[in-house]
């Protein structure tokens, strides 16, 4: 990732769009469909770089994956017939691929090595390794904490585990490993995190029990898995950039269709409403993974908010662009209890503050979040995504508050989750002219 992009978009934005399929759900659907013997079709998947790394790894395990225009067809021999890979399993920039497959491959007992790019090599893996070791996984890393992760065969045991942080990746690694245990596993969450692993377990016929913050799997749950087709909703994390772009750009009026609004992911909608933003939902579907059309209009004079507690995991990936939105509030805003931001593609507390402060905004990082003061775009300094796709897109949205072009280094990082981001933003601008 090394190309720069000069952003020269001003709005207003008008029209109707859809955003790419949800990244979290695409990863998990690929994994579960690959475990199930037979054919599964995943419709409207995200075909960004992260999800391609997950696909590539299952191909190395013996799964046939065929890409079509708006779907992927997965023809699996079943987990019982996976082959041992004879090369390093490269996860690229994908923390989801790395952490979830650490659990899944430990459960499968397949000798393997997981390794990613330079960014992944800096991200700690101890939080996922700790519970897996309690489950008798044979897994080790560099300094017991970093990739590459070396996995060797072992017999996975069920555990009772109290989560120490609200992390869907850690939770999912435990649940995926537990599928292969002869004992039940009981997991209690710290705060409820995104539940796509649980909803997709049920979709692929894997028994799972959920009572409040407590989740339980049954012994050898993997034996129940069946191939299934799955339609991936639009990613609310991708929609977030258009939501904020419309809210801060005078004259904007947009609708984003078929966006996933799973309650464990829809924190940004609640935050925008608390700020007095003009946002409405329509065409709301029901089910484990509900969707809606999101209608957003420009809103001046936004209210100040404090974002904390269980609202944080429900908006964790959107917090950088929410921080940008908070610079346009009438008074100072606070984000707290967001330590999880430190172990994303970058330390997003520091990166968000550093990059926005370079542009003249006023953000103060804290040990667990940010204090964001009302402030304006004052400098067209060159900024850098730091190879973080969400930082890159957040900075592109920040440029809307300037009348001058903005140069963003390493902007190709956005291809991790949204390869067509800029063309879609320009499309809405063209409709607004």
UniProtKB/Swiss-Prot annotation:
Pathway: Metabolic intermediate biosynthesis; chorismate biosynthesis; chorismate from D-erythrose 4-phosphate and phosphoenolpyruvate: step 6/7. One of its GO terms (biological process) is chorismate biosynthetic process. The active site is at residue 317. It is found in: Cytoplasm. Phosphoenolpyruvate binds at residues 23, 95, 123, 169, 348, 390. GO terms for molecular function: 3-phosphoshikimate 1-carboxyvinyltransferase activity. This is 3-phosphoshikimate 1-carboxyvinyltransferase. It comes from Staphylococcus epidermidis (strain ATCC 35984 / DSM 28319 / BCRC 17069 / CCUG 31568 / BM 3577 / RP62A). The lineage of its organism: Bacteria, Bacillati, Bacillota, Bacilli, Bacillales.
């Amino acid at each position: 990732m090394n190309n720069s992009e000069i952003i020269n978009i001003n709005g207003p934005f008008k029209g109707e769009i859809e955003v790419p399929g949800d990244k979290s759900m695409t990863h998990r659907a690929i994994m579960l469909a690959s475990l199930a013997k037979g054919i599964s079709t995943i419709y409207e998947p995200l075909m960004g770089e992260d999800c391609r790394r997950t696909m590539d790894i299952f191909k190395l395990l013996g799964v046939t994956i065929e890409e079509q225009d708006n779907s992927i067809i997965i023809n699996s021999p079943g987990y019982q017939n996976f082959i041992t890979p004879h090369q390093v399993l490269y996860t690229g920039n994908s923390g989801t691929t790395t952490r979830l497959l650490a659990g899944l491959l430990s459960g499968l007992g397949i000798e393997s090595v997981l390794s990613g790019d330079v960014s992944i090599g800096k991200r700690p893996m101890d939080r996922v390794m700790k519970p897996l070791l309690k489950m008798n996984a044979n897994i080790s890393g560099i300094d017991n904490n970093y990739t590459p992760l070396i996995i060797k065969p072992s017999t996975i045991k069920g555990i009772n585990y109290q989560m120490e942080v609200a992390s869907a990746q850690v939770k999912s690694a435990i649940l995926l490993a537990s599928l292969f245990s002869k004992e039940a596993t009981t997991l209690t969450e710290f705060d409820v995190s995104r539940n796509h692993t649980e909803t997709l377990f049920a979709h692929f016929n894997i028994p799972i029990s959920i009572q409040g913050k407590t989740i339980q799997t049954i012994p050898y749950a993997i034996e129940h898995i069946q191939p299934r087709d799955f339609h991936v909703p639009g990613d609310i994390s991708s929609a977030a950039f258009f939501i904020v772009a419309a809210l801060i750009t005078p004259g904007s009026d947009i609708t984003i269709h078929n966006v996933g609004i799973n309650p464990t992911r829809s924190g940004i909608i609640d935050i925008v409403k608390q700020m007095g933003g003009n946002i409405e939902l329509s065409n709301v579907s029901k089910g484990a993974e509900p969707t809606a059309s999101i209608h957003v209009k420009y809103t001046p004079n936004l209210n100040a908010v404090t974002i904390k507690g269980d609202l944080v995991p429900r908006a964790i990936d959107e917090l950088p662009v929410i921080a940008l939105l908070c610079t346009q509030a009438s008074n100072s805003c606070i984000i707290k209890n967001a330590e999880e931001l430190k172990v994303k593609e970058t330390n997003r507390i520091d990166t968000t503050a550093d990059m926005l402060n370079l542009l003249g905004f006023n953000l103060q990082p804290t040990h667990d979040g940010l204090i964001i003061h009302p402030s304006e775009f004052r400098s067209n300094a060159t900024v850098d995504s730091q190879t973080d796709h969400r930082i890159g897109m957040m900075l592109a949205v920040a440029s809307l508050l300037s009348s001058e072009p903005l140069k963003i280094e390493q902007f190709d990082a956005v291809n991790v989750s949204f390869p067509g981001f800029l063309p879609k933003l320009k499309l809405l601008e063209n409709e607004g002219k």
